[in-house]
Amino acid sequence: MLKMGVVLFTFLVLFPLATLQLDADQPVERYAENKQGLNPDESREIILSALRQRDCCEQGWCDGGCDCCQ
């Protein structure tokens, strides 16, 4: 009888808790409302400005493929 109680407890309590996705398990959607309404030109400008902030190649190794070397 004890074994059946343990099995019932496992399947009725622990199994649903392990399979439920709680709010903490969901990825954060930061500023999703602000970025969905942008037109393609505005979103392209945001992406390009973020790419410009990256470190560029060194002057000796520059092949002219990045904007900051010009």
UniProtKB/Swiss-Prot annotation:
GO terms for molecular function: ion channel inhibitor activity; toxin activity. Pfam families: Conotoxin (PF02950). Transmembrane segments: none annotated. Keywords: Disulfide bond, Secreted, Signal, Toxin. InterPro entries: Conotoxin. Its main location: secreted. Residues 25-54 form a propeptide. Disulfide bonds join C56-C68, C57-C66, C62-C69. Expressed by the venom duct. Belongs to the conotoxin M superfamily. This is Conotoxin TsMLKM-02. It comes from Conus tessulatus (Tessellate cone). The lineage of its organism: Eukaryota, Metazoa, Spiralia, Lophotrochozoa, Mollusca.
